[in-house]
Amino acid sequence: MNQTYGRLVSRASIAATAMASALLLIKIFAWWYTGSVSILAALVDSLVDIAASLTNLLVVRYSLQPADDEHTFGHGKAESLAALAQSMFISGSALFLFLTSIQNLIKPTPMNDPGVGIGVTVIALICTIILVTFQRWVVRKTQSQAVRADMLHYQSDVMMNGAILIALGLSWYGWHRADALFALGIGIYILYSALRMGYEAVQSLLDRALPDAERQEIIDIVTSWPGVSGAHDLRTRQSGPTRFIQIHLEMEDNLPLVQAHFVADQVEQAILQRFPGSDVIIHQDPCSVVPREGRKFELV
């Protein structure tokens, strides 16, 4: 699984870096030629894209290193750090756009040949949609937080390029402040995306539990297993591609230790079959030592 995960995540990061680099060169020319503040916004965003995608590429390779004596749970948290770094990069670009947009609202500057800007923006829009489609597929296969953060960023780029097209079209017909107004709106949306991305990264670093749906699946697997009378103290978290799952099984007092161990192994394999690559720890408790009021997920 780790090899497939690493290959897909690395390809997604390389594709994002290559596309952002190519679009940056095109946008530099378009901004120089037209003077559009909206295209300047897209140019700054491409710079952030490159920095973020390169960070992802380096961090993902580090996060895939096996556990060692100093990092016994692996290096998966590096992905969350990459997502947090991305949110900082994006926030900085959003603040830059605010200042530039306000300046152009106060003193609007007519553009030279908006048609060139429109052509460049259409190319950027098509390329970004293709990249986001590929990233969404990688996220569905790997659940990589770093690629998900990158995907959210490029999804905002799709909306941004659409807004730029409208702004350039309005400017073509003489409404020069439209360029700055749309750039300001883009900056607000980019800042919102950055804050949301940073929040998710911090939650992962704080070991937030797995989603409710996944925890419910674990509970259903455990409590429906023959020989298991109930369960409690389910604890979950995720680090990179690895889910960490801990749970206590409640079993009949007279069940032999060997049989209890066998049942726990079966439950562990069932969980691993549903969530491959997970780190599962199961503890067996006799029913009599678990206070009834302290039980959770008890079978009725």
From Swiss-Prot:
Catalytic activity annotation: Zn(2+)(in) + H(+)(out) = Zn(2+)(out) + H(+)(in); Cd(2+)(in) + H(+)(out) = Cd(2+)(out) + H(+)(in); Fe(2+)(in) + H(+)(out) = Fe(2+)(out) + H(+)(in)
- Coiled-coil regions, chain positions: none
Q: Which UniProt keywords apply?
A: Cell inner membrane, Cell membrane, Ion transport, Iron, Iron transport, Membrane, Metal-binding, Transmembrane, Transmembrane helix, Transport, Zinc, Zinc transport
The molecular function terms of the Gene Ontology recorded here are:
cadmium ion transmembrane transporter activity; ferrous iron transmembrane transporter activity; metal ion binding; zinc efflux antiporter activity
Regions that span the bilayer: 24-44, 82-102, 114-134, 156-176, 178-198
Record's InterPro entries? Answer: Cation_efflux, Cation_efflux_CTD, Cation_efflux_CTD_sf, Cation_efflux_FieF, Cation_efflux_TMD_sf, CDF_Transporter
What GO terms in the biological process aspect are recorded for it?
intracellular zinc ion homeostasis
Q: What is its main location?
A: membrane
Location(s), subcellular: Cell inner membrane
Please give, as recorded in its UniProt entry, the membrane topology of this protein. Answer: Multi-pass membrane protein
- What are its GO cellular component terms? plasma membrane
Q: Which Gene3D superfamilies match?
A: Cation efflux protein transmembrane domain, Cation efflux protein, cytoplasmic domain
Task: State where Zn(2+) binds.
Answer: 45, 49, 153, 157
Q: Which SUPFAM superfamilies match?
A: Cation efflux protein cytoplasmic domain-like, Cation efflux protein transmembrane domain-like
The UniProt function text for this chain reads: Divalent metal cation transporter which exports Zn(2+), Cd(2+) and possibly Fe(2+). May be involved in zinc and iron detoxification by efflux.
Matching HAMAP family: Cation_efflux_FieF (MF_01425)
Q: Which family does it belong to?
A: Belongs to the cation diffusion facilitator (CDF) transporter (TC 2.A.4) family. FieF subfamily.
The record's note on quaternary structure and interaction partners says: Homodimer.
The record's listing under PANTHER family reads: CATION-EFFLUX PUMP FIEF, MITOCHONDRIAL METAL TRANSPORTER 1-RELATED
Name of the molecule in the record: Cation-efflux pump FieF
> What species is this protein from?
Salmonella choleraesuis (strain SC-B67)
**Taxonomy-wise, where does this protein's organism fall, top ranks first?**
Bacteria, Pseudomonadati, Pseudomonadota, Gammaproteobacteria, Enterobacterales
